[in-house]
């Protein structure tokens, strides 16, 4: 069947119709109704409403969770997915669509995070089901740095908040094999990551980035002070990863050696 024939059978709702029914659903709470409409109700690519109340959203999610439940139907160690379940997960009764909907209904027992409510089972948007993701360590090369930058752009496009750690990048002044001879250091690449965060926006909302560095990294002092210049790294929050070794040195008023790697 042609794609356009499928689309013609999909019900759409007017804004006023959805507003009226969602206000009734939330027992007169207009703020709750408008929040649900703006953030979580499924819409098509022309911004037409495809869901009229949270019940329809909950059925959409229940259908997708039930689909995943069926993957574990064969309760056997020969099932590759089975071994990743907890003991409870291996032994519990499988849930069907109706039972899952019961847990979602009226937001009584389970309220998923926002990205799940807006994105799960929604074919009209490209989005992640995780609100936040921590990327693996950055490979210490230009290729590795640009790869991480590309990952950031793709994740921000999908409305994820992202955390990265730059401790694997060599400190300023160390020898490198390129024409420059020495590296500008880990902190110098923060601006690139920050700019990507600001530039990739969804619905007027920029991405969210956390950059961390180990307290033992030789560039840590530069990292700490980089945002004293209010024009620098404006698209990211920054934090130091403290170690027991450092905290013991503080407690004992002893020396602490910076090092890389």
Question: How would you describe each model-predicted region?
Answer:
Residues 1-261:
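Extended catalytic cores of very large enzyme megasubunits
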């Amino acid at each position: 069947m042609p794609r356009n024939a499928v689309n013609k059978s999909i019900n759409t709702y007017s804004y006023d119709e959805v507003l009226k029914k969602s206000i009734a659903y939330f027992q007169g709470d207009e703020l709750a109704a408008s929040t649900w409409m703006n953030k979580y109700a499924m819409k098509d690519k022309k911004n037409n409403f495809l869901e009229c109340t949270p019940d329809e959203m909950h059925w959409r999610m229940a259908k997708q969770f039930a689909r995943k439940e069926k993957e574990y139907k064969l309760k056997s160690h020969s099932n590759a997915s089975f071994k990743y379940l907890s003991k409870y997960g291996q032994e519990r009764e499988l849930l069907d669509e109706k039972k899952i909907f019961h847990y979602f209904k009226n937001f009584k027992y389970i309220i998923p995070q926002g990205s799940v409510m807006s994105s799960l089972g929604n074919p009209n948007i490209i989005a992640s089901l995780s609100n936040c993701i921590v990327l693996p360590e950055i490979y210490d090369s230009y290729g590795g740095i640009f790869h991480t930058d590309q990952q950031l752009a793709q994740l921000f496009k999908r409305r994820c908040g992202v955390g990265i750690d730059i401790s694997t990048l060599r400190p300023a002044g160390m020898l490198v094999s390129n024409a420059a001879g020495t590296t500008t250091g880990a902190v110098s690449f923060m601006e690139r990551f920050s700019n990507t965060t600001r530039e990739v926006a969804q619905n007027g909302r920029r991405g969210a980035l956390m950059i961390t560095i180990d307290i033992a990294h030789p560039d840590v002092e530069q990292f700490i002070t980089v945002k004293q210049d209010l024009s620098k790294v404006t698209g990211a929050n920054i934090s130091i990863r403290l170690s027991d070794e450092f905290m013991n040195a503080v407690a004992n008023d002893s020396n602490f050696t910076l090092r890389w790697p």
